[in-house]
Amino acid sequence: MLSSAHLVPTSVQRAQSWICRSSRSFMDLKALLSSLNDFASLSFAESWDNVGLLVEPSPPHTVNTLFLTNDLTEEVMDEALQKKADFILSYHPPIFRPMKHITWKTWKECLVIRALENRVAVYSPHTAYDAAPQGVNSWLAKGLGTCTTRPIHPSRAPDYPTEGAHRLEFSVNRSQDLDKVMSTLRGVGGVSVTSFPARCDGEEQTRISLNCTQKTLMQVLAFLSQDRQLYQKTEILSLEKPLLLHTGMGRLCTLDESVSLAIMIERIKTHLKLSHLRLALGVGRTLESQVKVVALCAGSGGSVLQGVEADLYLTGEMSHHDVLDAASKGINVILCEHSNTERGFLSELQEMLGVHFENKINIILSETDRDPLRVV
């Protein structure tokens, strides 16, 4: 005899699930944005990218349902509105190039109009999620098998450890007016000044150290140049933001155990749920050639992977000539189409955000979002 659970139609189960989810509380838009930045800082996005809140309804705006998609198309927007979304997180920014007008003439302008008319916020993390330790590239690497990974191009810390990008140091001897020097330096905006005793050239002196910006550096040097002794003993150091070991673009993955290219292909197909992918064999390689090191980049990996030493490049798309260049070096190349290397991450993101937001809001995944290219 079948249990009653098996007799409930799927549509009814979905409706019941929707009712349960809809009972959750709301989040204020500003609080949600702050929490999203805590999850993965937008400061890690590439400088050319357009990330963050792209469409904002008039305040106040509260969010009950967050809708996840890889690409915000007109079909996906229809789905988001049908599911009463208040906030769309679109991995790819639907607004990238500047818009000179908002009319019904182009599909992207229509998206903006529909979002505003229906009070739906639109947000894109894009390359910030590529760089994140728990982001898209790290998810893509999970399909390779047990391996150690590191970013191909590590990100730098978002802020300098101290104020300013330059450190300037010099010594003041007893014959010079220390108070005047310190007073003048502290009068320059954007400068952090410290002093400490030091012994230089056999005499007791005061060592002055200050951090400053490029602009204030020129002001400080103009002052010091008035005293030849001070100016000639001045040292300038450039301060760099420290590299972050687990954050950055692309991933270089070293497998614990080498596998044949044929086995690696099947692993990637399984992980991405693809029946086909595109393969360029490296010169002198076969399907039985061993793969130990994989360099990967979700989406378009040509610039990120260029010049990286590996047995295999894995990405969504590369230019014809980049593929030829890699193959000439004996590097195998696997292309899976751009968004096929990204979209699967959203299921994992849905779970992570649920935990991050302590299940305060509904988080749903688009069912209509798909890569525009198909193998026919």
From Swiss-Prot:
It is found in: Cytoplasm; Nucleus. Its main location: cytoplasm. Residues 243-376 are annotated as: Mediates interaction with COPS2. The modification Phosphoserine is found at S258. SUPFAM superfamilies: NIF3 (NGG1p interacting factor 3)-like. GO terms for cellular component: cytoplasm; mitochondrion; nucleus. It comes from the Eukaryota. One of its GO terms (molecular function) is RNA polymerase II-specific DNA-binding transcription factor binding. Pfam families: DUF34_NIF3 (PF01784). The modification N6-acetyllysine is found at K108. Keywords: Acetylation, Cytoplasm, Nucleus, Phosphoprotein. Ubiquitous. Detected in all tissues tested with higher expression in cerebellum, heart and kidney and to a lower level in cerebrum, lung, liver, spleen and muscle. Gene3D superfamilies: NIF3 (NGG1p interacting factor 3)-like. The modification Phosphothreonine is found at T254. GO terms for biological process: negative regulation of transcription by RNA polymerase II; neuron differentiation; positive regulation of DNA-templated transcription. May function as a transcriptional corepressor through its interaction with COPS2, negatively regulating the expression of genes involved in neuronal differentiation. PANTHER family: NGG1 INTERACTING FACTOR 3, NIF3-LIKE PROTEIN 1. Belongs to the GTP cyclohydrolase I type 2/NIF3 family. This is NIF3-like protein 1. The gene is Nif3l1.
